[in-house]
Amino acid sequence: MANKLVYTSAPKGLMPGTFGFCTVAATRGMTKTVVDALEGLAGYRRVYETTDGASLNPVAFSHLLVDTPRGRLRVLARIADALPDYSGRTNHIASFLQLGDAETHESGPAELFYTPGLFETQWPNGQPPIFYPSPVEIPMEEGACPRSCEYWRAVAGDPGWAGVLASTIETRRLAILVVPHSIDVLKLFYEAIAILPANKRWDATFATYYTNALRNVDCLWRGVVVDSPEEAQARAIAGNLVLDFRTLPSIESFKTNPAIWRWIEIAREPISKLAPTLKTPLVPAPSLQTPPPRVSVQVPPSCATVVPSAAQVSVPDPATPTPQKESTVAVPAMKTQRNSQ
């Protein structure tokens, strides 16, 4: 079971007196520490300022470890541009799951982003804020067997590159993928995680669309957009693994490094007969169309129109909350802000 929180711009937030960018839905009983930590991750930076930005800007999928005064949190986040809010201004929606160890099934974190219904993809104007009465049940499927990394073959020329990325789990080496508009970074991470041993898949923390807002969290694999500030910063730090999909070197150069070459050979293996079929993701394959002019500040990948999903849980209006047990901590009031962080 996992706590869930949704953050977007709305005329009325979950707590009395909140509006603008605020929490509009949360699992009843979440502590202030958890709420504050998730809201601190809810910022979003656009690549394109267009009338249809929600379909062109990247969707940020993240698996993060976040330190708080009361311990470390494991967080899955889906953050995306959204249609204009109730006031006509730009908007985005952030949907979070805070997981415990019992929810770390063998398929790994990326698998959950392909599971329908776990993350909110829109919050219609006028929809009232809600408390989810109980935590979200996480599907506990059998672990994925290593599969052939066909998407890596398609975009990098050799599935072995997935092994280069996977090798960083052993060394804890920071890995940065510099990607153009057309590459689906979530699919790259999904395949690389699949070749890891089942007990190592949750060691892969990642952000498909990394920005400096995430600098104080555990995030080992980072997708950054071409020519972004984050790309320049990554190259300035010695020891980082930087995979620039515009200029990948010959993969044969890794033959002199047995530790990495072993993973390259694993990634080149044919698909296992036991490997599950890849589900249809919440975000279809990115369009290869020529992107529109960018705004002055640039950022990362994974663009596409998302399939909307409305909240599925019937819950009471926060104006008349259901009585809680004394041991339950109610979701606290948050400061009213219009700033999109």
Role assignments for model-derived ranges:
Residues 288-290, 294-341:
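Low-complexity, Pro/Ser/Thr/Gly/Ala-rich intrinsically disordered linkers and tails that serve as
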Residues 1-292:
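N-terminal module detector in large eukaryotic regulators
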